[in-house]
Structure formats: structure tokens, C-alpha cells
Amino acid sequence: MLMNDYNGWKNQATWSVNVLHMETIVEMLNKGNSEEYIKFQIKDSCKPEDMNLYGRDMFYSAWATIDWYTIFNRAKENMEQTV
């Protein structure tokens, strides 16, 4: 798969977090929340514990591939651009 398949993001899971949660991540960073807390809140909002066994397994497999370093760096860049 080519990088441009996900608009330059590492994989589909990372791209999905960018599309679905970036605004929330920026807001939470602005409020002083830690990166670990933000990841917990995003995971909690997806409610993997309510998924069936197969859905939960797929969720955690995708979760493990998210490039959080790039996500948080992009969020910080977005914060700097809005100042």
C-alpha cells in the first residue's frame, strides 16, 4: 500500500484517529491533559469492552498500530498554527 493511500499517514488506524479525533486531541492538549490521558479517553469513547470478541480483537489490533508520536506532533503543530 502506498503512503498516499492514507493521505501520508502511516496506516489506516492512524489516519482514522487523525480524521475522527484530531480536534478533540488539540482541545485536550490545550487544556493541559497528558498524552496518555488523551489516549485513554479516545479508547474509552470507542467502548471496546462493549464489543463482541471479534470486534474487540480487531479494535485492539488496529489500536496497536496507531502512530501516536506523529498524531501528537501534528496536534502540536495545529496548536501553534492557531496561536
Segments the model singles out, each with a brief description of its role:
Residues M1-V83:
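Acidic interaction surfaces
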